[in-house]
Amino acid sequence: MEGVSTAKRALAVLLTAVLALGTVLLATGCSSNSGEGSSNSDPITVVFLPDNSSADMEASRDAVAEIIKNATGRDVEIMTTTDYNVAIEALVSGQAQMGYLGAEGYVQANEKNDKVQCAFTASDANGTLDEACYYSRICVKTENADQYASGDTYSIDNIKGKSFSFVSATSTSGFAIPSSSIVSHFGLESSDQLLEDGTFFSSVMFGDSHQGSAVNLLSGNADAAAFDDIDVDMYFDLVSGEPNTVGAVYQVKDDAAAPFDTVRGEQFTIIGITPVLNAPFCYNTDTLSEDEQQAITEAMTSADTAANSAIFYDGEDENATGLVEKESDKTAFVAVEDSWYDPI
């Protein structure tokens, strides 16, 4: 009887040990799985196009990062780029969870991955989307503007055979819009004809940013160039004409920062111009929870953000920089849906 009792006691001890080990393993397994499945401790990466990646835009990027961090409780990392495609692919792949893209860049990103969705964009002066646009411009050096005169105004009639600078093949206002205008104006088959040296233009170059394209023109490397207003006008003074109209003349400021420090005092004249839908901030919705998306959108479209001078800059202040010009007290970020970009 004593042998049986001893065996029972040994079996009981063994079962207790197994159960205890199972409990430990279960707890460890749950803990491990919980850590792997949680991404709330990871930083949110926000990618910016080359035009907003320059050193003088750092305060603007930091202001956006701070708002997102306060809204989500997560750290934020800023990703700057020197290539439009890199920014688009970062958002498409999920390497970046948010991005500030041009309208064309957003459409391309959404076509590659429908989980990339626009969230909010800058409003018009009335705080609405009714006239929420900026401008794509085709410009020439003012000293050569007479070559493009058409009566008492200017036109793009004589750009054929000239050297031309675009921003990037994925830029909305630096390629898609101006190339569409040129194709339509000259009855070309497609914009592909604009990309090869000697086909339509004598030579074609890319600035890789709106600033770079403008410098290509002002330095004399290109006879004509496409670039927008919102990414470069803080470096210029309006010399004559109405802002963003054909015939308007702009001059690089005497104290303009790089890359315009090499072309200070140079002037350009607008010979073609087209309005463009404002650029959106976008989410990769696979990488941010719905609650996080809502929290960020609410924070970025708030009155506090609209009053943040690091993001919404005063156009009357020659030294001010930011992502969006504060056209009025009503200028702010407003929520936007994918369908708003259908015209692109």
Predicted regions: what is each one?
Residues 48-50, 82-84, 95-107, 111-115, ...:
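Beta->alpha turn/N-cap motifs
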Residues 25-29:
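C-terminal motif of bacterial Sec signal peptides marking the signal peptidase cleavage site
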Residues 38-53, 74-80, 162-165:
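Short, well-ordered beta-strand elements
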Residues 122-186:
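A conserved helix-loop-strand patch within extracytoplasmic ligand-binding domains
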Residues 50, 133-149, 272-290:
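A bilobed periplasmic-binding-protein/Venus flytrap-type ligand-binding module shared by bacterial periplasmic
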Residues 41-44, 48, 52-63, 287-344:
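An extracytoplasmic/periplasmic, membrane-proximal ligand-sensing/linker region
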Residues 31-33:
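Bacterial signal peptide processing site
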Residues 171-289:
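Pocket-lining segment of extracytoplasmic ligand-binding domains
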